[in-house]
């Protein structure tokens, strides 16, 4: 029951955030010439994964013609996925989730990436 409540709250949060994302027909179309990878730096079934997959459902409805492919990269406590995301070509074909652990990684010597290495496009879950 608790897990269902968490999923519903995550989906409600995403729905509220996307309400203001209604399109102006004059805006440029998002790249639809290939799959868009969504890097999830956690294992399948966890909170980050469930949130990302819920967000993907909304993005696919909003950006018709674009196919979003979830890619789980849980190795290294999320380091692998977040480093791959930071190093991705900035062409709109790679999106991803960044978790709170990013704030600790440089201090633990796990990686040199900081929040400055990412371009935030939304905050699907915020306290």
Where are these regions (language model features)?
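Short Pro/Gly-enriched coil loops immediately N-terminal to beta-strands
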Residues: 121-127
């Amino acid at each position: 029951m608790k897990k269902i409540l968490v999923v519903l709250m995550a989906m409600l949060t995403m729905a509220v955030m996307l309400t203001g994302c209604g399109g102006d027909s004059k805006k440029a179309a998002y790249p639809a010439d290939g799959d868009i990878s969504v890097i999830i730096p956690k294992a399948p079934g966890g909170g980050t994964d469930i949130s990302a997959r819920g967000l993907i459902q909304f993005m696919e409805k909003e950006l018709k013609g674009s196919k979003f492919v979830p890619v789980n990269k849980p190795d290294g406590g999320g380091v692998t996925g977040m480093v791959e995301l930071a190093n991705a070509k900035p062409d709109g074909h790679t999106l991803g989730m960044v978790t709170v652990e990013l704030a600790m990684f440089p201090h633990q010597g796990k990686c040199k990436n900081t929040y400055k290495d990412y371009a935030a496009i939304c905050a699907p879950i915020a306290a």
